[in-house]
Protein backbone atom coordinates (compact mmCIF):
# COMPACT_ATOMS: atom_id res chain seq x y z
CA UNK A 1 0.00 0.00 0.00
CA UNK A 2 1.36 3.46 -0.85
CA UNK A 3 2.03 5.65 2.19
CA UNK A 4 -0.72 8.19 2.86
CA UNK A 5 0.18 11.82 3.52
CA UNK A 6 -2.33 14.29 4.91
CA UNK A 7 -1.39 17.73 3.58
CA UNK A 8 -2.54 19.49 6.72
CA UNK A 9 -1.55 20.18 10.29
CA UNK A 10 -5.20 20.51 11.39
CA UNK A 11 -5.88 18.41 14.47
CA UNK A 12 -9.52 18.12 13.31
CA UNK A 13 -8.59 16.65 9.93
CA UNK A 14 -6.04 14.34 11.53
CA UNK A 15 -8.68 13.03 13.95
CA UNK A 16 -11.11 12.45 11.08
CA UNK A 17 -8.55 10.56 8.98
CA UNK A 18 -7.72 8.38 11.99
CA UNK A 19 -11.31 7.05 11.79
CA UNK A 20 -10.31 5.11 8.65
CA UNK A 21 -7.65 3.23 10.67
CA UNK A 22 -5.03 3.59 7.92
CA UNK A 23 -1.41 4.52 8.60
CA UNK A 24 -0.58 8.06 7.51
CA UNK A 25 1.73 10.97 8.17
CA UNK A 26 0.99 14.69 8.14
CA UNK A 27 2.96 17.52 6.61
CA UNK A 28 2.31 21.24 6.26
CA UNK A 29 1.91 22.49 2.70
CA UNK A 30 2.79 26.07 1.85
CA UNK A 31 0.15 27.50 -0.45
CA UNK A 32 -1.23 30.91 -1.32
CA UNK A 33 -4.89 30.79 -0.31
CA UNK A 34 -5.89 34.07 -1.97
CA UNK A 35 -9.09 33.68 -4.01
CA UNK A 36 -8.83 34.48 -7.73
CA UNK A 37 -11.04 37.21 -9.18
CA UNK A 38 -14.37 35.76 -10.31
CA UNK A 39 -13.57 32.31 -8.90
CA UNK A 40 -16.58 30.34 -7.68
CA UNK A 41 -16.57 28.93 -4.16
CA UNK A 42 -16.45 25.36 -5.49
CA UNK A 43 -13.55 26.18 -7.80
CA UNK A 44 -11.70 27.93 -4.95
CA UNK A 45 -11.82 25.01 -2.53
CA UNK A 46 -10.96 22.48 -5.23
CA UNK A 47 -8.01 24.58 -6.41
CA UNK A 48 -6.71 25.04 -2.85
CA UNK A 49 -7.15 21.36 -1.94
CA UNK A 50 -5.24 20.42 -5.09
CA UNK A 51 -2.54 23.05 -4.44
CA UNK A 52 -2.00 21.71 -0.92
CA UNK A 53 -1.52 18.15 -2.21
CA UNK A 54 0.73 19.25 -5.07
CA UNK A 55 2.84 21.42 -2.74
CA UNK A 56 4.07 18.20 -1.08
CA UNK A 57 4.53 16.13 -4.24
CA UNK A 58 8.28 16.78 -4.48
CA UNK A 59 8.86 15.45 -0.97
CA UNK A 60 6.65 12.39 -1.37
CA UNK A 61 7.21 10.89 -4.87
CA UNK A 62 5.59 7.46 -4.27
CA UNK A 63 2.66 8.45 -2.06
CA UNK A 64 -1.04 9.19 -1.92
CA UNK A 65 -1.37 12.80 -0.78
CA UNK A 66 -4.67 14.07 0.62
CA UNK A 67 -5.42 17.77 0.30
CA UNK A 68 -8.49 19.47 1.72
CA UNK A 69 -9.73 23.02 2.02
CA UNK A 70 -12.94 24.43 3.42
CA UNK A 71 -14.80 27.70 3.34
CA UNK A 72 -18.03 28.75 4.97
CA UNK A 73 -20.55 30.91 3.11
CA UNK A 74 -22.91 33.09 5.14
CA UNK A 75 -25.39 35.26 3.26
CA UNK A 76 -23.52 34.74 -0.01
CA UNK A 77 -20.13 35.78 1.38
CA UNK A 78 -17.11 33.61 2.12
CA UNK A 79 -16.41 33.63 5.84
CA UNK A 80 -13.13 32.50 7.37
CA UNK A 81 -11.96 31.59 10.83
CA UNK A 82 -12.91 34.33 13.29
CA UNK A 83 -9.59 34.24 15.23
CA UNK A 84 -11.08 36.48 17.93
CA UNK A 85 -14.22 36.94 20.02
CA UNK A 86 -15.61 40.06 18.32
CA UNK A 87 -15.44 38.50 14.85
CA UNK A 88 -17.03 35.28 16.13
CA UNK A 89 -19.92 37.29 17.59
CA UNK A 90 -20.51 38.94 14.21
CA UNK A 91 -20.38 35.61 12.37
CA UNK A 92 -22.92 33.97 14.67
CA UNK A 93 -25.18 37.03 14.52
CA UNK A 94 -25.10 36.76 10.71
CA UNK A 95 -25.75 33.00 10.82
CA UNK A 96 -28.66 33.27 13.27
CA UNK A 97 -31.86 32.00 11.61
CA UNK A 98 -30.01 31.40 8.32
CA UNK A 99 -28.72 28.51 6.24
CA UNK A 100 -24.93 28.48 6.16
CA UNK A 101 -23.20 26.38 3.49
CA UNK A 102 -19.80 24.77 3.92
CA UNK A 103 -17.80 23.95 0.79
CA UNK A 104 -15.04 21.40 1.28
CA UNK A 105 -12.59 20.68 -1.50
CA UNK A 106 -10.93 17.27 -1.47
CA UNK A 107 -7.99 16.06 -3.57
CA UNK A 108 -6.22 12.71 -3.68
CA UNK A 109 -2.93 12.90 -5.58
CA UNK A 110 -1.06 9.70 -6.45
CA UNK A 111 2.51 10.88 -6.99
CA UNK A 112 3.64 7.46 -8.23
CA UNK A 113 1.53 7.74 -11.40
CA UNK A 114 0.63 11.46 -11.24
CA UNK A 115 -3.12 10.80 -11.15
CA UNK A 116 -5.29 13.29 -9.33
CA UNK A 117 -8.91 13.18 -8.21
CA UNK A 118 -10.69 16.32 -6.98
CA UNK A 119 -14.20 16.98 -5.74
CA UNK A 120 -16.20 19.47 -3.73
CA UNK A 121 -18.65 18.41 -1.04
CA UNK A 122 -21.23 20.81 0.36
CA UNK A 123 -22.97 20.70 3.70
CA UNK A 124 -25.79 22.97 4.88
CA UNK A 125 -26.22 24.10 8.47
CA UNK A 126 -29.56 25.64 9.41
CA UNK A 127 -29.13 27.83 12.48
CA UNK A 128 -31.79 28.46 15.07
CA UNK A 129 -32.60 32.11 15.73
CA UNK A 130 -30.05 32.86 18.44
CA UNK A 131 -30.27 35.41 21.23
CA UNK A 132 -27.23 37.49 22.11
CA UNK A 133 -27.06 35.65 25.44
CA UNK A 134 -26.90 32.31 23.60
CA UNK A 135 -24.16 33.57 21.28
CA UNK A 136 -22.11 34.93 24.18
CA UNK A 137 -22.68 31.80 26.28
CA UNK A 138 -21.61 29.53 23.45
CA UNK A 139 -18.49 31.50 22.56
CA UNK A 140 -17.33 31.76 26.17
CA UNK A 141 -17.71 28.00 26.65
CA UNK A 142 -16.25 26.69 23.39
CA UNK A 143 -13.97 29.46 22.05
CA UNK A 144 -14.09 28.34 18.39
CA UNK A 145 -11.62 30.95 17.14
CA UNK A 146 -9.95 28.58 14.64
CA UNK A 147 -13.18 27.21 13.18
CA UNK A 148 -14.81 28.57 10.03
CA UNK A 149 -18.27 29.80 10.93
CA UNK A 150 -17.37 30.21 14.63
CA UNK A 151 -18.63 26.86 15.89
CA UNK A 152 -17.59 23.26 16.52
CA UNK A 153 -20.35 20.93 15.37
CA UNK A 154 -18.66 18.02 17.14
CA UNK A 155 -19.05 19.85 20.46
CA UNK A 156 -21.50 22.31 21.99
CA UNK A 157 -21.98 23.93 18.57
CA UNK A 158 -24.66 21.34 17.83
CA UNK A 159 -26.96 23.32 20.16
CA UNK A 160 -26.92 26.26 17.72
CA UNK A 161 -28.61 24.34 14.92
CA UNK A 162 -32.14 23.66 13.78
CA UNK A 163 -31.04 20.98 11.33
CA UNK A 164 -28.16 19.75 9.18
CA UNK A 165 -28.26 18.61 5.55
CA UNK A 166 -25.52 16.87 3.60
CA UNK A 167 -24.10 13.56 2.45
CA UNK A 168 -21.33 13.25 5.03
CA UNK A 169 -21.29 14.97 8.44
CA UNK A 170 -17.48 14.70 8.46
CA UNK A 171 -17.50 17.28 5.66
CA UNK A 172 -18.62 19.87 8.18
CA UNK A 173 -15.52 19.23 10.31
CA UNK A 174 -13.20 19.46 7.31
CA UNK A 175 -12.59 16.09 5.64
CA UNK A 176 -15.31 14.27 3.64
CA UNK A 177 -14.58 10.66 4.56
CA UNK A 178 -17.19 9.07 2.29
CA UNK A 179 -15.73 10.74 -0.81
CA UNK A 180 -12.18 10.08 0.41
CA UNK A 181 -12.92 6.38 0.93
CA UNK A 182 -14.23 6.14 -2.64
CA UNK A 183 -11.09 7.85 -3.96
CA UNK A 184 -8.81 5.58 -1.91
CA UNK A 185 -10.58 2.44 -3.14
CA UNK A 186 -10.07 3.64 -6.74
CA UNK A 187 -6.33 3.76 -5.92
CA UNK A 188 -6.38 0.24 -4.47
CA UNK A 189 -6.52 1.23 -0.79
CA UNK A 190 -9.63 -0.12 0.92
CA UNK A 191 -9.84 0.75 4.63
CA UNK A 192 -11.76 -2.48 5.26
CA UNK A 193 -9.18 -4.80 3.70
CA UNK A 194 -5.93 -3.09 4.69
CA UNK A 195 -4.44 -4.17 8.01
CA UNK A 196 -5.62 -1.55 10.55
CA UNK A 197 -3.29 0.65 12.55
CA UNK A 198 -2.55 -0.97 15.93
Swiss-Prot record:
CDD domains: Maf. It catalyses: N(7)-methyl-GTP + H2O = N(7)-methyl-GMP + diphosphate + H(+). The active site is at residue 69. It comes from the Bacteria. Its main location: cytoplasm. Gene3D superfamilies: 3.90.950.10. The record marks 12, 70, 154 as: Important for substrate specificity. Nucleoside triphosphate pyrophosphatase that hydrolyzes 7-methyl-GTP (m(7)GTP). May have a dual role in cell division arrest and in preventing the incorporation of modified nucleotides into cellular nucleic acids. This is 7-methyl-GTP pyrophosphatase. It comes from Yersinia pestis. The lineage of its organism: Bacteria, Pseudomonadati, Pseudomonadota, Gammaproteobacteria, Enterobacterales.
Amino acid sequence: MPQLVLASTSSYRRALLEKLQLPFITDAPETDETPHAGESTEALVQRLASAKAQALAGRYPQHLIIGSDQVCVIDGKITGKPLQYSTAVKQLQQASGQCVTFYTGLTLLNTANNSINCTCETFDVYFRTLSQAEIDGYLLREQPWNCAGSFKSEGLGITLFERLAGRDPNTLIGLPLIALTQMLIEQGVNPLTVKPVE
